[in-house]
Amino acid sequence: MSTVTTIKRGGLTAAIDSMGAQLTSLALNGNEYLWQGDPAFWGKHAPILFPIVGSLRNNTATSAAGTCEMPRHGLARIVEHKLVEVSEDGSSVTYEITDTPESLKAFPFHFKLNMTYALTGDATLTQTFAVTNTGDVDLPFSVGGHPAFNVPAPGADDETFEDYELAFTETWTNEAPIITPDGLMTFEGSYKAPDNSDVLPITHRSFDNDAIMFTDTPGSTLTLRGRKSGHGVKIDFEGFKYIGVWSAANDAPFVALEPWTGHTTMDTEDDVFEHKVNTITLAPGETDKRTFSVTLL
């Protein structure tokens, strides 16, 4: 049975469910910023993505170790995680999963994944993925976050979804691939951000083709904010090549900001797991750490 652990620092609180090691609340002075999982739109909050981000073609791939067969975004989000540490001051918590006979049927590699959530500032949550190769062959994988935030944000008064924008740290041009109807990624009909822009307005229609994926974002920083109030969230994701931005259908009142090291299979790729673009390869005994942080505005 899953349990929820709450960490605190001043007026900032975060709650994490051991099922999937998923963040389920992020509140400042009692004001909830994290999407609360209304199933009418999307029944999750902030799943962790491992050992894949997005989908494999037909949910399967071959590898040197055998067949990989798993659902969209991988296995970590759908299993119970062990609580291994809570800091003395109650401001951080670490969870762990390892491979099991069941996981090896879907992903035939040995691993350990530690997830640490830490409140590192008066309004900042830091999330760290630590992946260790516990096997004797190279471990291929991707990791990612999927936190979704309420739009409008707390304190936004009369703002609407259409009053929100994505702000970059400098002017920038980006061509973003889109998701095909069969769940693959393509540059055919890709989304192109306005040239030399540091602000991108969003509407519900921005997500008609699923997530928008930005590559090599300036400063590895992206801010989701209301144009009138300035309220929202800033995400810093150095070490993650991509940031996905997504909202659900039917005018869902949230936006997910998703740091990824990899992404769903491209329509031009083959079905060998190790060939997936930007897959991390970890030698036996090595550990890879990736961190992103969310600051509430």
Residue map of PLM features:
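Asparagine-centered strand-capping/turn motif at beta-strand->loop junctions
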Residues: 16, 129-135, 247
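Extended, loop-rich substrate-binding clefts of extracytoplasmic carbohydrate-active enzymes
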Residues: 67, 71-122
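Short Pro-Gly-centered flexible turn/kink motifs
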Residues: 16, 61-68, 129, 280-296
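Acidic/His-leaning functional-site neighborhoods
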Residues: 12, 73, 78-85, 197-277
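Acidic-aromatic substrate-binding/catalytic surfaces of carbohydrate-active enzymes
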Residues: 13-67
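Short, Gly/Pro- and small/polar-rich lid/capping loops
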Residues: 1-10
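Beta-strand-rich interaction surfaces with strong enrichment in secreted/lumenal proteins
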Residues: 114-116, 277-282
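Active-site/ligand-binding surface loops and adjacent short beta/alpha elements
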Residues: 148-237
